[in-house]
């Protein structure tokens, strides 16, 4: 708009002397906007990334949640700078890694004695934004305490759990309904097997599904390398939705969207 105003100032006197341009400056601005705004927008958009919301739509007409992974787009991991960025990048949710401390919780991928942002400050930033926060719990047994803090901060409706959510905690509907349950929380041996590069068998997948169904799990959180269309479909047939992490490639994201996953976690919530 500033560019159009500058153009208007340059041509205002000339425009007043022509017969084919509007005499009113306001009308002249509209004239310029109509003819030149598309060109300006096109020029300014070159080299910019497209918001990941452009990828939300799936082939079935539904929409997939997009979660900004901690430290997305080059921001410092588990920082308030990252949180503020993630709130305005078009993602539906943002992820932070959560550890307990004597007087609450801090956000950091690894345990630390140093200074780290307080989870309460994260909750204060997201309150009322409509953006959800995925608390990736890095310590067992803190599910209910984090939920209590979220309730006190008025963000419990925005809260999601992933990470170390125990089999015992998942029995509580208040925890279960907001959890993307990691397969390693249910069956730790499977994660170690994957880390070693040993493919999961279909028998193992079906055993995991049986456990999910017994526990009433609604959404599972899987490493994207484990997710095939067949497995996503098998989970769906059993009433279980799929969240995948961490997808940083647009073409890969499109494949998961077309497969109908519930959530994609990515370090690139703005994809080129």
Spans of model-derived segments:
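Phosphate-group recognition and catalysis centered on beta-loop-alpha active-site segments
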Residues: 3-272
